[in-house]
């Protein structure tokens, strides 16, 4: 059995970042876009934890906790806006929402 090295964590983080970026760029459903943004933030957290562990410095882990709390607040605000838009427009497709257009 081989030990898990920081390279494994970075590969996992790169895969999550790629999946999240593709989801944000290709999907039009706002729920899927929010989930993809959360995947990107989780990739950032894995990077922070991996480098924190490799460098024997706790600052990365503390910063990851702040990123998690920021992601929770972002998800709450995003879902609140999504519910308000759904009640107003009856759709969650990003292409059909033109509330900010004149």
From Swiss-Prot:
GO cellular component terms given for this protein: NADH dehydrogenase complex; plasma membrane
Pfam families found in the cross-reference section: Oxidored_q2 (PF00420)
Membrane topology category: Multi-pass membrane protein
Known catalytic reactions: a quinone + NADH + 5 H(+)(in) = a quinol + NAD(+) + 4 H(+)(out)
EC number: 7.1.1.-
Localization per Swiss-Prot or TrEMBL: Cell inner membrane
Recorded superkingdom: Bacteria
GO molecular function: NADH:ubiquinone reductase (non-electrogenic) activity; quinone binding
Family the UniProt entry places it in: Belongs to the complex I subunit 4L family.
Entry function: NDH-1 shuttles electrons from NADH, via FMN and iron-sulfur (Fe-S) centers, to quinones in the respiratory chain. The immediate electron acceptor for the enzyme in this species is believed to be ubiquinone. Couples the redox reaction to proton translocation (for every two electrons transferred, four hydrogen ions are translocated across the cytoplasmic membrane), and thus conserves the redox energy in a proton gradient.
The name this protein goes by in its record: NADH-quinone oxidoreductase subunit K 2
Organism: Solibacter usitatus (strain Ellin6076)
Organismal lineage: Bacteria, Pseudomonadati, Acidobacteriota, Terriglobia, Bryobacterales
């Amino acid at each position: 059995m081989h030990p898990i090295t920081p390279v494994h964590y970075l590969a996992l983080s790169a895969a999550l970042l790629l999946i999240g970026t593709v989801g944000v760029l290709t999907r039009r459903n706002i729920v899927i876009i929010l989930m993809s943004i959360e995947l990107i933030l989780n990739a950032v957290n894995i990077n922070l934890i991996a480098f924190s562990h490799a460098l024997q410095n706790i600052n990365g882990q503390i910063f990851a906790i702040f990123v998690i709390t920021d992601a929770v607040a972002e998800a709450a605000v995003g879902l609140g806006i999504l519910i308000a838009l759904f009640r107003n427009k009856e759709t969650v497709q990003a292409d059909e929402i033109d509330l900010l257009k004149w």
